Amino acid sequence: QFEAGDLVNARAQLEWAADKGSDPALRGLARLRLAAVLLQQGELDAALARLQAASSAAYRARFDDLRGDVLAAQGKAAEARAAYQAAIDALTAAGDDAVTLRE
């Protein structure tokens, strides 16, 4: 749904998966994608609420990266930069090559 541009249906399906899915890993992924939809819809506070805590270490960098995007959209440059740095730190801790994020 998201790729097709149908944000309303994508949001409904992702909300269900994030809140009621049986697999914790899939719930985490659904929360991440739901936050991206909310960002696209301009619902920045709701997007940030979905990103408050990564469901697992596997998603931590992605959550932090998207949190940076939401904070940047809110005009909170310093907080966004800190979130991007947290994403880089999570990637580094996981042994992944981190791409340097710039302003």
Question: Predicted segments — roles?
Answer:
Residues Q1-R62, R67, K76:
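Alpha-helical adaptor scaffolds
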Residues L14, V99-E103:
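Extracytoplasmic/luminal low-complexity segments enriched in Pro/Gly and acidic/polar residues
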